[in-house]
Amino acid sequence: MKTVTVKDLVIGAGAPKIIVSLMAKDIARVKSEALAYRETDFDILEWRVDHFADLSNVESVMAAAKILRETMPEKPLLFTFRSAKEGGEQAISTEAYIALNRAAIDSGLVDMIDLELFTGDDQVKETVAYAHAHDVKVVMSNHDFHKTPEAEEIIARLRKMQSFDADIPKIALMPQSTSDVLTLLAATLEMQEQYADRPIITMSMAKTGVISRLAGEVFGSAATFGAVKKASAPGQISVNDLRILLTILHQA
């Protein structure tokens, strides 16, 4: 399986990489939180742009991105607008969503974008090609905050992301039972062993799914999300505890 290298970070080799999400509402908070995050041990900074209030002002959005880039120049920056239908803070049109991601790509400030699988096949394919033409990697994602589908459906979604040339397919699902967590882990393992030719990220959410956030190296998930202050999804562990646990599992 090929790895994905962003800056000096090799995703898909060694222990799972730690992603933290910054969810500031304005430029002042972006700056203050970025300074606080700089003192934290993580691998990838995700900027959750759906939390940013001045979203209609592209210049303001890119000014905030510039602050993040200048504050943590060595960290890969993942630009993410999480749609309301997949658990995000704001609802915008598909056209606005694509335009926002294209603006981020054009800015030269971001290393990766998050692109939701169910945005629309044509729009997804075109945006992936556009990102790659500008040397920006694509994390293609799907989130279900209500349920966990069967393993076959999980694998089908991950394979579809791969067929759309995502650099890193990602899926996050809500378990209704412990069996759902096992379904997610089994699907991850099958995808990793039989179909994946690139790193994937999977997780089962909430307290029930915490084990999935730690066991990526065993089952085949290349990264996991940790909380610096407020968790961006249910079940996230503090970033400091997460690094300790991942290191223990990696060295065992």
Curated annotation (Swiss-Prot):
Enzyme Commission no: 4.2.1.10
Catalytic activity from the UniProt record: 3-dehydroquinate = 3-dehydroshikimate + H2O
PROSITE patterns cross-referenced by the UniProt entry: DEHYDROQUINASE_I
Active site: H143 (proton donor/acceptor), K170 (schiff-base intermediate with substrate)
Gene Ontology molecular function, alphabetical: 3-dehydroquinate dehydratase activity
Residues that bind 3-dehydroquinate: S21, E46, W47, R48, R82, R213, S232, Q236
Keyword Metal-binding: no
Keywords, in A-Z order: Amino-acid biosynthesis, Aromatic amino acid biosynthesis, Lyase, Schiff base
GO BP term (any one): amino acid biosynthetic process
Uppermost EC category: lyase
Pfam families membership: DHquinase_I
Metabolic or biological pathway, per its Swiss-Prot or TrEMBL entry: Metabolic intermediate biosynthesis; chorismate biosynthesis; chorismate from D-erythrose 4-phosphate and phosphoenolpyruvate: step 3/7
Protein task: Involved in the third step of the chorismate pathway, which leads to the biosynthesis of aromatic amino acids. Catalyzes the cis-dehydration of 3-dehydroquinate (DHQ) and introduces the first double bond of the aromatic ring to yield 3-dehydroshikimate.
Family affiliation: Belongs to the type-I 3-dehydroquinase family.
NCBIfam families assigned: aroD (TIGR01093)
PANTHER family, per the entry: 3-DEHYDROQUINATE DEHYDRATASE
Subunit text: Homodimer.
UniProt name for this protein: 3-dehydroquinate dehydratase
Organism: Shigella dysenteriae
Gene name in the database record: aroD
